[in-house]
Amino acid sequence: MNILFAGGGTGGHLYPAVAMAERLEQLYPGTTVAFVGTERGIEATEIPRLGYRLHLLDVRGFRRGFSFSDMLNNAGVLLDFVRAVVKAAGIIRAEQPDVVVGTGGFVSGPLLAAAELMGRKTLIQEQNAFPGVTTRFLAAFATEVHLSFEESRKFFRRKQGVFVTGNPARSFTGIDQAEAQSFFGLQPGLPTLLVFGGSRGARSINNAVKTWISGAAGKANIIWQTGSLDDERLRKEVEPSATLWIGPYINDMRMAYGAADLVLCRAGASTLAELTNLGKASVLVPYPYATGNHQFFNAKALVDAGAAELVADADIALDQSRTKVFSILADPELRLRMREACRKEGRPEAALDLAGRIAGLANIK
């Protein structure tokens, strides 16, 4: 069975594809997996590191404005898209995939379009409650569309071939907390806060956490993924310690989640899938410029379930936000209630279910 995945730009689009690929390889030995991405996305480094073959397309997104500059840019984007579809068709002829799977990001569009024009079986996996424009358009022609939220159905005209299977997430279970804390050089036994804002980082979160370090010393461990955007600056301003690990990227998220009692992060759908599958208490800071404000709606679902707290991006630097975070970190009973509520929202079998659907499309039993 040959499967070709397209998805990336950010971890939110890439890691669901990786989760499905890993499960396919576990369930169906001999499966061949390849990826299509861009050189600007996280996939350019992550996919080779994971040992998969990667094809690159040159594609970028449309601007949403109506100025002359925006329209000129979008004309170029459209031309790039057509060229990318032609190149994607060549990749499909070379790989001969049984199924082409798209998980979002700019690169999914041309590969899915080429696959659908060539009559290949296609599966779209949408992570967010508010599907993107490309997903909604290509879904009309896809063999199957898989959603993470029931409420997303209303955005699609078609009724057949649309399923709610959840968001496939990487598996991070089976880690002893004290071992994980020691892995980061931290003090076992202290409550531990895990902070991250994506591969590039979140400047608002980084600036807030920088002011929290001195007050947390001796009371809590902090594992802080700064992202590439602020790494150089923060390394000059903040020193690691026995209670602080700081770095641009965490290569072993299994250990990071295993060490954490509370997670402070954005509210991307893939991150929330990982949190709910693990049952991790969290304070969510939705990215305010996400399309359709979808991170807010992703976060609200967990907040309404009692599984998380929400802090607006504009408020993260306020004293009350710091107080909220460290109050939860210091309250084991509250964290337990949040963990239990969070686990109820998870769909840990999503990767398994989707692997089965992909195999079914490939006529593999």
From Swiss-Prot:
User: Enzyme group, top EC level?
Assistant: transferase
Give the family this protein belongs to, as stated in its UniProt record. Answer: Belongs to the glycosyltransferase 28 family. MurG subfamily.
Does this entry carry the keyword Cell cycle? Answer: yes
Lineage, top-rank taxon, reads Bacteria
The UniProt function text for this chain reads: Cell wall formation. Catalyzes the transfer of a GlcNAc subunit on undecaprenyl-pyrophosphoryl-MurNAc-pentapeptide (lipid intermediate I) to form undecaprenyl-pyrophosphoryl-MurNAc-(pentapeptide)GlcNAc (lipid intermediate II).
List the catalysed reactions: di-trans,octa-cis-undecaprenyl diphospho-N-acetyl-alpha-D-muramoyl-L-alanyl-D-glutamyl-meso-2,6-diaminopimeloyl-D-alanyl-D-alanine + UDP-N-acetyl-alpha-D-glucosamine = di-trans,octa-cis-undecaprenyl diphospho-[N-acetyl-alpha-D-glucosaminyl-(1->4)]-N-acetyl-alpha-D-muramoyl-L-alanyl-D-glutamyl-meso-2,6-diaminopimeloyl-D-alanyl-D-alanine + UDP + H(+)
Q: Which SUPFAM superfamilies match?
A: UDP-Glycosyltransferase/glycogen phosphorylase
Q: What is this protein called?
A: UDP-N-acetylglucosamine--N-acetylmuramyl-(pentapeptide) pyrophosphoryl-undecaprenol N-acetylglucosamine transferase
So what EC number does this one have?
2.4.1.227
**Compartment annotation:** Cell inner membrane
Swiss-Prot/TrEMBL keywords? Cell cycle, Cell division, Cell inner membrane, Cell membrane, Cell shape, Cell wall biogenesis/degradation, Glycosyltransferase, Membrane, Peptidoglycan synthesis, Transferase
What residues bind UDP-N-acetyl-alpha-D-glucosamine, as annotated?
10-12, 128, 170, 199, 250, 295
Q: How does it sit in the membrane?
A: Peripheral membrane protein
Record-level Gene Ontology MF annotations: UDP-N-acetyl-D-glucosamine:N-acetylmuramoyl-L-alanyl-D-glutamyl-meso-2,6-diaminopimelyl-D-alanyl-D-alanine-diphosphoundecaprenol 4-beta-N-acetylglucosaminlytransferase activity; undecaprenyldiphospho-muramoylpentapeptide beta-N-acetylglucosaminyltransferase activity
* GO BP terms in the entry: carbohydrate metabolic process; cell division; cell wall organization; lipid glycosylation; peptidoglycan biosynthetic process; regulation of cell shape
Instruction: Provide GO CC annotations from the record.
Output: plasma membrane
Signal sequence segment: none
InterPro entries from the UniProt entry:
GlcNAc_MurG, Glyco_trans_28_C, GlycoTrans_28_N
According to UniProt, this protein's pathway is: Cell wall biogenesis; peptidoglycan biosynthesis
Q: What is its main location?
A: membrane
